[in-house]
Amino acid sequence: MDMTSLWGRLAKLQSFFQDGLNVDENSHLPEADLRKISLGNLYVYQQQGVLNTFETGVTPSVRKVILGEYFGITDRDSAIETLNWLSQAPSQTMFHYAYTAFLQGGGNISRKWLNENEELKEHTDFRNDCLEKLETMEEKYPDIEQAGIVVSKEEMGKLGVLAWDAGRLNFISRLCLEQEYIVKEECMQCINAAYEMTKEVYTNWKDYAY
């Protein structure tokens, strides 16, 4: 099913759910554009925004809280700085260390590898974040494998967490545009960058969503 027909069906289904999916029946974005904006739609959905339009539909008050309190974005300069940071896929960097530790065998052996890593010794906050990610990885990997998302630890390493970084970059750049911190061209650069992050890694929406 192509994306255009998918959103059409979602619009019809919406009427059956009081708090269902929020789609605009009058929106007719090309499928290529829908693919790109959909990368940020988990976050749009969480804020009860519109899923099939370029505009997120997030209310101004909520938008201000997300940008200001969660991401420290209060003006153009902070918006550019944060979007540049998000475009570097920071979660993927953390995943690299946590995943490498995970491959050491798990448990205390993996934690020892992170704690003794020379590259992390002067970055204790980042190292602690990596330790948390390692714990989550050890807890969730059996479920990921059982669900058929990956068939091995090596395949999980290839998938990484680029979906998380790409989704945030997509969503936050659109909020910044709506808050008038950036212009449309800059927003599109972020959206395209997010799409490029994922298209070579995820071959289907199931892999991306997980």
Where are the regions that the model predicts?
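Polar/charged low-complexity regulatory segments
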Residues: 2-188, 193-210
